[in-house]
């Protein structure tokens, strides 16, 4: 990883590491079953998608593990940013925390009494708050994460990513309300792994929507929210290109350009 960081720096590229939490963690959970609720033995995923096996916010082992990971990342990556993930945490979201004994004990300790599953988002808030504090106080890093509409409170100074197709306006309004910065990468304009034309699907796909060159270029970075939003909240614009359906470097370039220009 150090070689990659050094190589990128030669071309004035800053590499920002992302460690997903609490979802998209099956590889780590497979090796360390103590990371998930019930300490389940979880097989490695061989296909893309969303897993219901999440990091357990009620287990101190989770925080020990993440602390070790972030310590190593902070040493390897000079970037002032570290991405915490936060998206696609199960179907329904965070559901495996509902009946977990460790999670129940944490809810009791935090005084959480609701039982409509909103309590699980408060556990996610607790998990993120602890990790955000670690990144800021120990390593001087600015936390980033994917915005989900049920994640109501965003710590000031964090950078959220607006990505979900059709929910960009809500994400931007949440950033303004929480005095947070936001990276604009809406699925309807900026997902470069989506095909540019009907019938031009990658060999492996899940029925992706089409994002034409015209759609990409029609992106309004301020999303109609005006100059104050651009000045105070807009962090930037990102094109996302996930490799789960990409089987060659040539396909990466084909998908990225000219839409990324």
Where are these regions (language model features)?
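Substrate-binding cleft of carbohydrate-active enzyme catalytic domains
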Residues: 1-141
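Flexible, acidic glycine-rich loops studded with aromatic residues
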Residues: 143-261
């Amino acid at each position: 990883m150090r070689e990659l960081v050094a190589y990128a720096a030669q071309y004035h590229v800053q590499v920002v590491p992302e460690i997903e939490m609490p979802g998209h963690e099956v590889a780590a959970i497979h090796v360390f079953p103590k990371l998930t609720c019930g300490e389940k033995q979880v097989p490695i995923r061989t296909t893309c998608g969303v897993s219901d096996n999440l990091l357990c916010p009620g287990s101190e082992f989770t925080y020990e593990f993440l602390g070790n990971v972030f310590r190593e990342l902070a040493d390897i990556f000079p970037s002032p940013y570290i991405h915490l993930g936060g998206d696609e945490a199960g179907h329904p979201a965070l559901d495996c925390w509902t009946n977990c004994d460790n999670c129940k004990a944490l809810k009791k300790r935090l005084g959480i009494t609701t039982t409509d599953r909103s309590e699980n988002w408060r556990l996610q808030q607790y998990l993120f708050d602890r990790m955000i504090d670690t990144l800021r106080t120990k390593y001087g890093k600015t936390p980033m994460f994917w915005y989900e509409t049920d994640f109501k409170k965003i710590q000031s100074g964090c950078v959220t990513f607006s990505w979900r197709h059709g929910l960009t306006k809500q994400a931007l309004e949440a950033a303004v309300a929480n005095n947070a910065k936001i990276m604009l990468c809406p699925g309807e304009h900026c997902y470069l792994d989506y095909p540019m034309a009907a019938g031009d699907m990658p060999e492996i796909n899940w029925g992706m929507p089409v994002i034409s060159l015209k759609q990409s270029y029609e992106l309004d970075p301020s999303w109609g929210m005006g100059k104050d939003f651009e000045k105070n909240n807009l962090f930037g614009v990102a094109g996302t290109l996930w490799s789960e359906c990409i089987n060659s470097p040539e396909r990466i370039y084909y998908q990225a350009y000219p839409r990324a220009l």
